[in-house]
């Protein structure tokens, strides 16, 4: 859980910007999106292997 306290003489926009930055740094939003819907274990394995295959192909390319 990210917590941001508005500082003295700080605009709300600046505080919101700091909050968004802290949320993106600690991965709260990504974790929420990942857990938003249930994924069967078989689907998780399939996505994981596809991602590994994609990374492997990406590393193998040479320009």
Swiss-Prot record:
Biological process, per Gene Ontology: translation
One Pfam family this sequence matches: Ribosomal_S21
Compositional bias ranges of the Basic and acidic residues kind: 40-52
Keywords: Ribonucleoprotein, Ribosomal protein
Assigned protein family: Belongs to the bacterial ribosomal protein bS21 family.
PANTHER family from the UniProt entry: MITOCHONDRIAL 28S RIBOSOMAL PROTEIN S21, SMALL RIBOSOMAL SUBUNIT PROTEIN BS21
Protein name: Small ribosomal subunit protein bS21
Lineage, highest ranks first: Bacteria, Bacillati, Bacillota, Bacilli, Lactobacillales
């Amino acid at each position: 859980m990210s917590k941001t306290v508005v500082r003295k003489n700080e605009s709300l926009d600046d505080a919101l910007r700091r909050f968004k930055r802290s949320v993106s740094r600690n991965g709260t939003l990504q974790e929420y999106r990942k857990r938003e819907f249930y994924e069967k274990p078989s689907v998780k394995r399939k996505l994981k292997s596809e991602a590994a295959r994609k990374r492997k192909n990406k590393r193998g390319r040479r320009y």
